[in-house]
Amino acid sequence: MATLSLHSHSFLLVLLPFILILRQNLAVAGGCQVPPVIFNFGDSNSDTGGLVAGLGYSIGLPNGRSFFQRSTGRLSDGRLVIDFLCQSLNTSLLNPYLDSLVGSKFQNGANFAIVGSSTLPRYVPFALNIQLMQFLHFKSRALELASISDPLKEMMIGESGFRNALYMIDIGQNDIADSFSKGLSYSRVVKLIPNVISEIKSAIKILYDEGGRKFWVHNTGPLGCLPQKLSMVHSKGFDKHGCLATYNAAAKLFNEGLDHMCRDLRTELKEANIVYVDIYAIKYDLIANSNNYGFEKPLMACCGYGGPPYNYNVNITCGNGGSKSCDEGSRFISWDGIHYTETANAIVAMKVLSMQHSTPPTPFHFFCGG
């Protein structure tokens, strides 16, 4: 017992500086006098309950155990990066667009992200193109209701709200990861990347034509470091930190293309503010320097089945019968083999808010409403 207490004390000493920095960033950015409107498009990295609302899919405890003390449809033990970013702007956590039970709680925007989403094929739920069409319907309906009923005007987002909103895009991971899972070779996966980039570019241009001017684009993380991938791929092609080199190489190529796309769009869309965020660098740093952050076994899931080295079994995933979760998720980077723990998400958010990984460097409170 004494050993456990000492270990916990040491861990808190390691983590405390990051918690304090995050709180400081939240306080500075949280000075928004007018909370912003935010629209998010993405996959499970930023899904705040869309899959549950849209398909009735059950995501139960232990998901959500550390912050919400209940399952919210998020694939984590607590908050996601997008939740911390919303809190930094002093706005409510985003509700899923498909959640019909939240009443008028779309005044600060909506979240179109859904678990498993990709950019291609375009018309398969819930691809980026489908999410975009949902947004266009949402906008049309909101403006219609605001125009015909005075009582509803206070609850609806108006033209200025859509024009000044922040449009966040975090998608592409599944396009790459699923291609590998289907048995495609590295060269074939790489050939798909330009098409994925093209879909994201098209979405931004459509949003721009609809009046959007503020865009926040996340690249994809180190796919080769996910316990899920590591447990399912029999390969000797590991990098020095134990990650799958080919998966990470493909992710880097995708990120390079996404960066170039953002640079091109800044030239093409003269009035747009487009911020590119290097999530890959942030997340890989957590893996490479896990001890500095107080994490144990950086390539092992907290919740899953099978034990070391990865604690992931595709037939017994987190939350399903037979799976087990660790006592302290704060000591793990990976929650369920694919998604991050709240502690890891908090550190990622802190580093995002630092502007050190953003191009161009932009304080997040730039997106305050007004």
Curated annotation (Swiss-Prot):
The residue stretches assigned to a coiled coil in this entry are none
Q: Which InterPro entries match?
A: GDSL, SGNH_hydro_sf, SGNH_plant_lipase-like
GO molecular function per UniProt: hydrolase activity, acting on ester bonds
Keywords attached to this Swiss-Prot or TrEMBL record, sorted alphabetically, are: Glycoprotein, Hydrolase, Lipid degradation, Lipid metabolism, Secreted, Signal
The active site annotation covers: 44 (nucleophile), 336, 339
The record's top EC class is hydrolase
Localized where? Secreted
Principal location: secreted
Q: What start and end residues bound the annotated signal peptide? A: 1-27
**Record Pfam families:** Lipase_GDSL (PF00657)
**Glycosylated at which positions?**
90, 315
Q: Which SUPFAM superfamilies match?
A: SGNH hydrolase (SSF52266)
Q: Name one GO cellular component term.
A: chloroplast stroma
What superkingdom does the record give? Eukaryota
EC numbers listed for it are 3.1.1.-
- What's an example Gene Ontology biological process for this entry? lipid catabolic process
Q: Family per UniProt?
A: Belongs to the 'GDSL' lipolytic enzyme family.
Q: What is this protein's record name?
A: GDSL esterase/lipase At1g09390
